[in-house]
Each structure stands twice: as C-alpha cells, then as structure tokens.
C-alpha cells in the first residue's frame, strides 16, 4: 500500500482526536474525547533486517498508528471513556528479529508487545505491502485487546482454566474480526466455542447479529457473572431463552448454509 494512504491514516487520527465528534453505538451516543491514550515507547530491535525496513516504510509513524488502533479496540469493548477500562499508562512496543508473530506481556499500568520482523518479511513475500499492513493491523488489534479486555472472575486464571483462556483468546480475535482484521475466508464451520482464537472469535462476532452491543456486554459480563461461564454470560447478555449450545448450533448451521450457497 502506498505511503500516501498511511499518511492519510495519520491525518485521520489527528483530526479525530482533536474534534468534538462522537462515536455512535446502536442508539447510544458515546464521547471518547476524554480517553487518555497511554504513552507508547516504540523500540526497534531488528535494525538491519528486511522486515524492519518494510515495517518502517509502511508505518512511518508507529506512535500515531498504535494509538489509532488502541481507540478502535476500546470503542469495540466499551461504550465510552467513562467505563471501567483498564488504566494502561504505558505500552512498550518492540520490533524484534525473532520467530513467532507477536505477544503481549505485563499488565496494568504497563504492558509490552513484541512484533516479529520475520513475520513482516514473510507477509510481504505472501502479498506485498497490502498484506503486511493488513496483517500488522490485525495482529496489533489482537494484542491490544489483551491489554484492554476485562477478565472472567471466580474461575482461576489464563494458565489454570480453559474457559478463562478461551474467553481471553476468543475475545481478542472477536475484536480483530469485528474490525475487519481477518480475511472473510477464515471463517469456517467446525470446532467448538471453547477452541479459542478465531473459532471462538468469529462466533462471538457473529453474536453481534443478535445484539449490536454484544461484544461490549459480553466483555462487561465478566464483572457481573461470577463465577463466569460462557452459558451464564450468554443468558445474562441475551436472555435466559438462549444457551451457548443452541447458539453454537445455529451459528454452525449458518456457516454451513452459506458455504453451500
């Protein structure tokens, strides 16, 4: 993608941050003028690599780029800046010459995210600059969600409970999917809502067809449904007539029907 488009992204962010315009969610108008962006400490640890050269060419102002995506994440998870948003004050973002893709570490008030220059180079080889920008944004949305999402209560933690893990990874990919961060062809029938990542994420994103604010309400359910469970949260958000099994079966039927058509 041409640099001019990236500069347009930068201009759009600066304009939106300085304007009085509101974000409309369903029938509720939400102002984000008071949202406090964290400090972004961007460090290049992959100097001299092809991946870094590609990243630096495509994203000339990473601070602005990262903050733009932060706003997209919090607007997907919350109604306004007055909500109970984790108070992330600093993000250490590094480009590193390592295998893998990306990962988030730490917690409030300071988190760290690394992104692999090797993955950038691989993406470039698979689809040019457009693929790099698409993949970089999608991966960033996922990792930023880990910083800003709420966590299930009363069921252990990420390493000890599969439901907790499935929620965390599923919501991160749901936010990514909701903001156009995956190819549409990635959504396929099969699996289980407990599989996490894209399998869970696409399912949760599909549930916005039941309620446009589903992802916000599902995120907030972690504070209201204790001990937390998928079925308990579904009933809390959509009503007692719904169940996780029933909605999953409906979702699978929808995917299968679309695949045949």
Q: Residue ranges of each PLM-predicted region?
A:
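Short pre-active-site segment immediately N-terminal to the catalytic Zn-binding motif
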Residues: 119-140, 155-164
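Active-site recognition of the HExxH zinc-binding catalytic motif
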Residues: 138-151, 169-173
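Pan-zinc metallopeptidase signature
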Residues: 200, 207-261
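Auxiliary, metal-adjacent structural segments of Zn-dependent hydrolase domains
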Residues: 22-23, 56-114
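Acidic/histidine-rich, surface-exposed loop or edge segments in extracytoplasmic proteins
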Residues: 34-60, 118
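C-terminal motif of bacterial Sec signal peptides marking the signal peptidase cleavage site
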Residues: 15-16
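Post-HExxH zinc-binding segment in Zn-dependent metallohydrolases
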Residues: 159-200
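Positively charged n-region of N-terminal signal peptides that target proteins for export
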Residues: 1-4
């Amino acid at each position: 993608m041409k640099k001019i488009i990236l500069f347009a992204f930068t201009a759009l962010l600066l304009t939106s941050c300085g304007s009085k315009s509101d974000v409309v969610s369903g029938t509720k108008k939400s102002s984000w003028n008071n949202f406090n962006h964290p400090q972004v400490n961007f460090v290049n640890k992959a100097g001299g690599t092809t991946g870094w050269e590609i990243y630096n060419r495509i994203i000339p102002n990473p601070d602005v780029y990262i903050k733009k995506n932060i706003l997209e994440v919090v607007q997907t998870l919350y109604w306004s800046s007055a909500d109970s948003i984790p108070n992330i004050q600093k993000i250490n973002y590094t480009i590193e010459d390592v295998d893998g893709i990306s990962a988030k570490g730490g917690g409030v008030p300071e988190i760290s995210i690394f992104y692999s220059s090797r993955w950038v180079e691989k993406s470039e080889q698979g689809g040019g600059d457009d693929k790099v920008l698409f993949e970089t944004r999608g991966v960033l949305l996922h990792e930023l969600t880990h910083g800003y999402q709420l966590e299930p209560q009363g069921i252990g933690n990420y390493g000890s409970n599969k439901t907790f893990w499935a929620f965390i990874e599923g919501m991160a990919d749901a936010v990514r999917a909701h903001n156009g961060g995956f190819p549409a062809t990635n959504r396929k029938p099969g699996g289980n809502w407990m599989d996490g990542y894209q399998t869970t994420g696409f399912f949760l994103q599909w549930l916005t067809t039941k309620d446009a604010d589903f992802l916000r309400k599902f995120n907030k359910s972690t504070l209201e449904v204790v001990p937390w469970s998928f079925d308990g949260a579904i009933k809390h958000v959509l009503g007692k007539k719904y169940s996780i099994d029933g909605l999953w079966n409906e979702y699978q039927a929808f995917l299968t029907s679309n695949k045949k058509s």
